[in-house]
Swiss-Prot record:
Segments of skewed composition (Pro residues): 1-21, 147-160, 699-712, 848-858, 976-988
Protein name listed in UniProt: Collagen, type I, alpha 1a
Record-annotated Fibrillar collagen NC1 domain positions: 1062-1095
Alphabetized SMART domains for the sequence: COLFI
Comp. bias (Low complexity): 22-49, 127-145, 180-223, 232-270, 288-297, 385-400, 477-489, 498-544, 577-592, 625-661, 675-697, 804-822, 872-893, 924-960
Disulphide-bridged cysteine pairs: none
Subcellular locations according to the entry: Secreted, Extracellular space, Extracellular matrix
Biased composition (Basic and acidic residues): 58-72, 894-908
Biased composition (Gly residues): 161-179, 299-311, 602-611
Region (Disordered), start-end ranges: 1-1011
GO molecular function: extracellular matrix structural constituent
The organism of origin for this protein: Epinephelus caninus (Dogtooth grouper)
This protein's UniProt keywords: Collagen, Extracellular matrix, Secreted
GO cellular component, one term: extracellular space
């Protein structure tokens, strides 16, 4: 049977087609560049005189005039300042002694003299009477500290201090011993089915099963191959001639006969497929001239003509603009001498004279009165300790302590509400140019512009009318044989042949490949119970407890790295039809089709409308230069275009100059607490503390390895239509694809039959076919003439070949035969009728790109595209100038507690005092005897932070430590008497057994975060969970206060009485807790807090 045809490779590119008919006229070209400047015109007439220039610069100063005449005497000047004293005159001679005068009147008392020196101390006078008590003097300055007095008795314990700030996490403890094995957990839910494992090796063959019941009849198998031909039977007796038999099988081809006489020409065969293009034929004889063609398209615009002759002079131009200011003129001649000046005013007073010499000393004064008494002497040595005084009045509350240290930064709060819109930012960079606005209305016609540059090549014009049929060329050489035609459709089923003899048994087939694994079998019966196992080793730490309630959603994390690409989703629905794409480049010229036969002439059509004007013809020779026309009127301004889009953001400007200093801001709130003081000396070691509560869950571990990609997601919703992308660059030509499936049979009529292939090798004998249906009886033959019955002859030679029988059913295709020898070329057949139009050939290689088309008019503005994705962050701008210092922030929230300090020793239990206000601490007393261990002391000063250890596993709670030995007691405890009057408060001793809930927060346990409540229906459920978890955490911590035997008093709260929720949060206001007389000195007590309402 003929082999299936395979499409051949693409043929070579056909010859270039004839040039297309001229294209339509192109659009008006762009305005050309301005022409070269014309030559300068002749000089205009002289303009009128310009306006006067501005005044020139001042001339240089003239030379000095001659001195004027002397002025008249001026009026007297004002009184001058007093001159310096003159020097003392020389001492005069002594005069003669005068006569004694009379006694004068007593003079006035002289002024008291300066105080004389201190007199010697007088003798001690007698003791005077005691004066009245003076008013209380001001407090003296504090004296130097006296030596410490003896230790007073221990005072009652003060109230516990407020909780200290939370300490930093301590260093990681060592890992505790492994606990006993926990109880076995309940079986988990069955996991999902694992992926199918690889096929196992084939097992050994099992024993043969019992014979199954016969199955239902199977579908009839395909017909087997024909069996080998059976041996000939013995010759039978000659029968009577039977009816005409069915056609026999085709015999083997006979030997080649001699050539017969030339037959008559057959009917023309069906046209074969077109052969490949022949080589170019010789040029035919020149045809007759055709009819005149249509008028050609106008040629391209000619280049600019030669330069014209200069025109005649134009009229005089308008008056010129005012000239620039002239240069300064030369210096003028020297001026005449001026008049004399006025007389000058009197001068300023002279400088002060020098100081005179000092006078002689005066006489001594009288003795002054005694001076005040001297200062007090130094304090004497301390006196003995006085008797114990009465208790003082309760003091006023002390001043507010200094603010504690700033807390550690709190956890990041919930995202706040969106802030108000910020002030407008700086002007952005200039945006990219916006799209062109719509064209404005046309202005009035301007003057004729200079000649434009030649326009771009126009688009190809429409197809011209068909030319007349050319004369036939010379006959080409015969083409090569075409490719083998496709296989014909399958013929009708032939009549069934006789049933063949059974074939021999075929060899056993090869062993089949192992089958796929069967489904799981039914569950087997339970096996017998095994023997009990030996005691196993203790198990590992038990499974974690039940999962706690869900926490609040965390803050939004930073954006994760881009995940791995997921598996391709199922294809989405078809999107909406896209916009029409841009016009493609013109394809390469197709091969010239066969020329059609001329159709009948149509009737004459009506006259067409007037055609568009042709392109401008070539320039004629330049005419003589015309006179210059008057200037045309200015055109009206065009309409204002729409504003373009905002430009891109400009570069940041240089920083502005510093502004003036602003007015001082308002007084800021109290600043943060100052730095922490230096660490105090460590106290004596404290008693063993209670075991800490279980630590909080450690920080999340490092990210696990990325999981396998998730299953493909379902198809997404139909996305919005994307913006139209820009046309991408042309891809490179792809490689030849694999051969496609054979197309449907074309409409071509059958090709010429190909040469006969060599006979294929004989197929394997087929299995015995099913019994065919009985054939139809053949047509009755003519009866033979009865011959004389001869004796039985021997078997004669084979008779001549009978006529060929009808075609049997087509056998299965044989293997492809080897190609036959090339036959000799047949004679040229007569030309067949014109074939139907062939199917489009494969696309040729892309032609060279055509010239660019003329730019089209500006299209209407498109709709705004969807908002683009956020672009990558731009580079950071340069830092702006520092802003003014903002006001001080509000006082921060109270920070976490500091680390626990080292515990102090336990003090003795004091007598019960008044419940007074907490006094200031007294000086440290000397250590008393070792008393019984007190409760844990308050938190000490915060130690320096150790380097944070890596978080250890949460250890199991340790067993309670042993109780310390009791201290010595004075005597047996007598029966309790009635409470006596309160005793005086003792001097403060070393800090003792006050006790503070802060000790519950162990260094590695962070107290529960204060919870927030919102008035929002969606948050109610979360809030309830959060309240639960907070209270559960509190109760777990307080549970560690239980007494050693586990008994405790509990007061349960049975309902939540909260009726309103304010949206604010509050701390549980347990400000202080002072257990009084709980029992024995080392008695523990418990406290459990249930739900609370804030009123």
């Amino acid at each position: 049977s003929p082999a299936m045809p395979v499409p051949g490779p693409m043929g070579p590119m056909g010859p270039r087609g004839p040039p297309g008919s001229p294209g339509a006229s192109g659009p008006q070209g762009f305005t050309g560049p301005p022409g070269e400047p014309g030559e300068a015109g002749s000089a205009g007439a002289m303009g009128p005189r310009g306006p006067a220039g501005p005044p020139g610069k001042n001339g240089e100063d003239g030379e000095s005039g001659k001195p004027g005449r002397g002025g008249e005497r001026g009026p007297p000047g004002p009184q001058g300042a007093r001159g310096f004293s003159g020097l003392d005159g020389a001492k005069g001679d002594s005069g003669p002694a005068g006569p004694k005068g009379e006694s004068g009147a007593p003079g006035e008392n002289g002024t008291p003299g300066a105080m004389g020196p201190r007199g010697l101390p007088g003798e001690r006078g007698r003791t005077g009477a005691a004066g009245a008590a003076g008013a209380r003097g001001n407090d003296g300055a504090a004296g130097a500290a006296g030596p410490p007095g003896p230790t007073g008795p221990a005072g009652p314990p003060g109230f516990p201090g407020g909780p200290g700030a939370k300490g930093d996490a301590g260093a990681q403890g060592g890992r505790g011993p492994e606990g006993p094995a926990g109880a076995r957990g309940e079986p988990g839910n069955p996991g999902p089915a694992g992926a199918a494992g690889p096929s196992g090796n084939p097992g050994t063959d099992g024993a043969a099963g019992p014979k199954g019941t016969p199955g239902a009849a199977g579908v009839a198998g395909a017909p087997g191959f024909p069996g080998p031909r059976g041996p000939s039977g013995p010759q039978g007796a000659a029968g009577a001639p039977g009816p005409k038999g069915n056609t026999g099988e085709v015999g083997a081809p006979g030997a080649k006969g001699e050539a017969g006489a030339k037959g008559e020409a057959g009917a023309p065969g069906v046209q074969g497929p077109p052969g490949p293009s022949g080589e170019e034929g010789k040029r035919g004889a020149r045809g007759e001239p055709g009819a005149a063609g249509a008028r050609g398209a106008p040629g391209e615009r000619g280049g600019p003509g030669g330069r014209g002759f200069p025109g005649s002079d134009g009229p005089a131009g308008p008056k010129g603009a005012t000239g620039e200011r002239g240069a300064p003129g030369a210096v003028g001649p020297k001026g005449a001498t001026g008049e004399s000046g006025r007389t000058g005013e009197p001068g300023l007073p002279g400088a002060k004279g020098m100081t005179g010499s000092p006078g002689s000393p005066g006489p001594d004064g009288k003795t002054g009165p005694a001076g005040p008494s001297g200062q007090d002497g130094r304090p004497g040595p301390p006196g003995p300790v006085g008797a114990r005084g009465q208790p003082g009045v309760m003091g006023f509350p002390g001043p507010k302590g200094a603010a504690g240290e700033g807390g550690k930064p709190g956890e990041r709060g919930v995202m706040g509400p969106t802030g108000a819109a910020g002030a407008p930012g700086k002007d952005g960079d200039v945006g990219a140019p916006g799209p062109s606005g719509p064209a404005g209305p046309a202005g009035e016609r301007g003057e004729q512009g200079p000649a434009g540059a030649p326009g771009f090549q126009g688009l190809p014009g429409p197809q011209g009318a068909l030319g007349e049929t050319g004369k036939p060329g010379e006959q080409g050489l015969p083409g090569e044989a075409g490719a083998t035609g496709p296989a014909g459709a399958r013929g009708d089923r032939g009549f069934p042949g006789e049933r063949g003899a059974p074939g021999a048994l075929g060899p056993a087939g090869a062993r089949g490949s192992p089958g796929s694994x069967g489904n799981d079998g039914a569950k087997g019966d339970a096996g017998a119970p095994g023997a009990p196992g030996a005691q196993g080793p203790p198990g590992l730490q038990g499974m974690p407890g039940e999962r706690g309630a869900a926490g609040l959603p965390g803050l939004r994390g930073d954006r994760g790295d881009q995940g791995a690409k997921g598996a391709d989703g199922a294809p989405g629905k078809d999107g909406p039809r896209g916009l029409t794409g841009p016009l493609g480049l013109p394809g390469p010229a197709g091969a010239t089709g066969d020329k059609g036969e001329p159709g009948p002439a149509g009737p004459v059509g009506p006259g067409g409308a007037r055609g568009a004007p042709g392109e401008r013809g070539e320039s004629g020779p330049p005419g003589p230069a015309g006179f210059a026309g008057p200037p045309g009127a200015d055109g009206q301004p065009g309409a204002k275009g729409e504003a373009g889009d905002n430009g891109a953001k400009g570069d940041a400007g240089p920083p502005g100059a510093a502004g003036p200093t602003g007015a001082p801001g308002p007084q800021g709130p109290v600043g943060n607490t100052g730095p922490k003081g230096a660490r105090g000396a460590a106290g004596p070691p404290g008693a063993t503390g209670f075991p800490g509560a279980a630590g909080r869950v450690g920080p999340p571990g490092p990210s696990g390895n990325p999981g396998p990609p998730g299953p493909a997601g379902g198809p997404g919703k139909e996305g919005p239509k994307g913006n139209r992308g820009e046309t991408g660059p042309a891809g490179r030509t792809g490689e030849v694809g694999a051969a496609g499936p054979p197309g449907p049979a074309g409409e071509k009529s059958a090709g010429l039959p190909g040469p006969q292939g060599l006979a294929g090798q004989r197929g394997l004998p087929g299995q015995r076919g099913e019994r065919g249906f009985p054939g139809l009886p053949g047509p009755a033959x003519e009866p033979g003439k009865p011959g004389p019955s001869g004796p039985g002859g021997e078997r004669g030679p084979p008779g001549p070949m009978g006529p060929p029988g009808l075609a049997g059913a087509p056998g299965e295709p044989g293997r492809e035969g080897s190609p036959g020898n090339e036959g000799s070329a047949g004679r040229d057949g007569a030309a067949g009728p014109k074939g139907d139009r062939g199917e489009s050939g494969p696309s040729g290689a892309p032609g060279a790109p055509g010239p660019p088309g003329a730019p089209g008019p500006v299209g209407p503005a498109g709709k705004n595209g969807d908002r683009g994705e956020t672009g990558p962050a731009g580079p950071a701008g340069s830092a702006g100038p520092a802003g003014p210092r903002g006001p001080a922030g509000a006082l921060g929230l109270r920070g976490d507690k500091g680390e626990s300090g080292e515990a102090g020793e336990r003090g003795m239990k004091g007598h019960r005092g008044f419940t007074g206000m907490q006094g200031p601490p007294g000086p440290a007393g000397s250590s008393g005897e070792q008393g019984p261990a007190g409760a844990a002391g308050p938190a000490g000063p915060r130690g320096p932070a150790g380097s944070a250890g890596s978080p250890g596993k949460d250890g199991m709670s340790g067993l309670p430590g042993p109780t310390g030995p009791p201290g010595p007691r004075s005597g047996e405890m007598g029966p309790a008497g009635p409470p006596g009057p309160p005793g005086p408060p003792g001097a403060p001793g070393a800090p003792g057994g006050g006790f503070d809930l802060g000790f519950l927060s162990q260094p590695q346990e962070k107290a529960p975060d204060p919870y927030r409540m919102y008035d929002d229906a969606n948050v109610l459920r979360d809030r309830d969970l959060e309240v639960d978890s907070t209270l559960k955490s509190l109760s777990q911590q307080l549970e560690q206060l239980r007494s050693p035997d586990g008994t405790r008093f509990t007061y349960s709260v049975l309902e939540d009485g909260c009726t309103s929720h304010t949206g604010t949060w509050g701390k549980l206001p347990l400000l202080d807790l002072a257990p009084m007389d709980v029992g024995a000195p080392d008695q523990e007590f418990g406290l459990e807090v249930g739900p609370v309402c804030f009123l």
